[in-house]
Curated annotation (Swiss-Prot):
Membrane topology, record value: Multi-pass membrane protein
Gene name of this polypeptide: mscL
Family under the similarity heading: Belongs to the MscL family.
Name of this protein: Large-conductance mechanosensitive channel
Highest taxon above the source species: Bacteria
Disulfide cysteine pairs (residue numbers): none
Species this chain originates from: Pelodictyon phaeoclathratiforme (strain DSM 5477 / BU-1)
Amino acid sequence: MLKEFKEFAMKGNVVDMAVGIIVGGAFGTIVNTLVSQVLMPPLGLLIGGVDFTNLYLILKEGSKAAAPYAALADATAAGAVTVNYGLFLNSVISFLIMAFAVFLLVKAINMLRREEKAPPLAPTTKECPYCLSIVPLKATRCSSCTSELGK
């Protein structure tokens, strides 16, 4: 049982997949940081100083403090029920950047990959030199004109 597991785990595809998952997780963290810390603050500034992480709708005020709340953290601390659409926008933008990066990566790999052409198949037929009909390669006599064919 252990030997079978070792063979399975050491197959190239399993190891490649594990490396891909680890690198993908790290890349996801980088993209999320890029979106939340680099892209969204200037975008929020351009559209009027809005912090996207603090965009939310209050469904029910909190029991500890009444609305309005200065930030999402204040609403959450007060026990308010909220729809956090700003965080959702950050996630959508992160996904779009991640999808575009994967697209560029796949496109680059496909450009580098050379199409391997299959070797030409060995001929299985030949042409009769007398009547020009097609006969099997191993034939010694033409089936159409009955001429003797050389080996």
